[in-house]
Design a protein with these regions (language model features):
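Intrinsically disordered, low-complexity linker/tail regions enriched in polar/charged residues
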Residues: 1-5, 12, 19
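Short amphipathic, basic-aromatic surface patches that mediate peripheral association
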Residues: 64-72
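Cysteine-rich micro-motifs
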Residues: 23-33
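Cys/His-rich microdomains that often coordinate metals
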Residues: 17, 33-34, 119
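Edge beta-strands of extracellular beta-sandwich domains
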Residues: 117-126
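Residues immediately within or flanking Cys/His clusters that coordinate Zn2+
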Residues: 7, 26, 112
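Short cysteine-rich clusters marking metal-coordination/redox-active sites
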Residues: 10-13, 29, 115
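Exposed aromatic-hydrophobic patches
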Residues: 62-64, 98-106
Length: 126
């Protein structure tokens, strides 16, 4: 089930993967086990990292942070993902781009945002 997706990071090169099903002990990169990412646990400004959204009919307009996250070359949101019971939608972002994107409204889905410096952040769509 997609809703149970877990994200892992390589502490050496920064690769991130989403594990939908399987044994996380099998996940290796750069010769070492990948580490589970725990959302909302980094010591960083919550108001700049937690995804926020506004419902517009059958979509949501998502951005990262009540105060929009900076999108600089050395500090930016790499991607936003919406994970529901049966699918994951991921939008890749780039430095100097806005974090704003539109996704389908999926009540109960989880929105994730991944900051290249401060890790994984999430919120639930109501």
């Amino acid at each position: 089930m997609e809703k149970n997706v877990r994200f892992y990071v390589c502490k050496t090169c920064g690769n991130v993967i989403g594990l939908i099903h399987g044994n996380p002990a099998m996940l290796r990169c750069c010769g070492q086990e990948m580490q589970l990412l725990e959302a909302n646990t980094e010591d960083a400004a919550v108001e700049k990292h937690v995804p926020v959204y506004e419902r517009v009919e059958d979509e949501i307009v998502v951005k990262v942070g009540e105060v929009e996250h900076p999108m600089e070359k050395d500090h930016y949101i790499m991607w936003i993902a919406e994970v529901s019971d049966n699918k994951t939608t991921r939008v890749r972002l780039f430095p100097e781009q806005s974090t704003e994107t539109r996704l389908p409204y999926e009540k109960g889905a989880t929105l994730y945002a991944y900051c290249n410096k401060h890790g994984l952040w999430k919120t639930t769509i109501e």
